[in-house]
């Protein structure tokens, strides 16, 4: 079993080293970048920890998870967020939730038609299922802060919109916490009609503005 664990780690770290290689402009030779080296070392350590912390039956699985998380940590902040972004894109495929990158931050835009009915702060089943996928990734990559912001369109009173947007942000946060995400990582805020991403003069624009954004930032 130990040989299998080390083989898994070696394969992961080797793949990372190859993918992280660059060409030295002075020698013309391929070299491993610092992030790739760090990721490879991290994968070896992570695989060992993952295997040791798992039961005999699950050691192979534990090694794989530990190797991935260790590689992300070893490769630095940028690599850590790169891997997390890729996993989120995979989980969010076909859900209607967009994943964008801004520097080292990852932003999930959850439109209202996915998450909530009109004037409601109760998550739809589709929204709850989507957040299950988000939570799975967040638990695998715990070194990120989670900022949940609720938005509305400009229809209705300002106080009502502020309250509703806060309630929706809180509902999303509660769902993540219920799925096992550490509550200490999460902050919520309701901004009502602020920061529109489309015009509030059309029904289509209003629909885009009714959303919850989850911003992930490195700790």
From Swiss-Prot:
Stored InterPro entries: Bact_OuterMem_StrucFunc, Gly-zipper, OMP_bac, OmpA-like, OMPA-like_CS, OmpA-like_sf
Regions crossing the membrane: 37-55, 62-84
Classification via CDD domains: OmpA_C-like
GO cellular component terms listed in the entry, alphabetical order: bacterial-type flagellum stator complex; cell outer membrane
Lipid moiety-binding region (N-palmitoyl cysteine): 21
Effect of residue 116 to A: Does not suppress BamB ts-mutants
Keyword tags: Cell inner membrane, Cell membrane, Cell outer membrane, Lipoprotein, Membrane, Palmitate, Signal, Transmembrane, Transmembrane helix
Signal peptide residues on this chain, from the entry's feature table: 1-20
Consequence recorded when altering residue 168 to A: Does not suppress BamB ts-mutants
Phenotype upon loss of function: No visible phenotype.
Subcellular localization(s) per the UniProt record: Cell inner membrane; Cell outer membrane
Domain of life of the source: Bacteria
Lipid-modified sites (S-diacylglycerol cysteine): 21
Domain OmpA-like: 103-219
PROSITE patterns to which the protein is assigned, alphabetical: OMPA_1 (PS01068), OMPA_2 (PS51123), PROKAR_LIPOPROTEIN (PS51257)
A biological process term (GO) from this entry: bacterial-type flagellum-dependent cell motility
Membrane topology: Multi-pass membrane protein; Lipid-anchor
SUPFAM superfamilies from the UniProt entry: OmpA-like
Gene3D superfamilies the UniProt entry points to: OmpA-like domain (3.30.1330.60)
Cross-referenced NCBIfam families: PRK10510.1 (NF007804)
Function: Suppresses temperature-sensitive mutations in BamB when overexpressed.
Name the record gives this protein: Probable lipoprotein YiaD
Organism: Escherichia coli (strain K12)
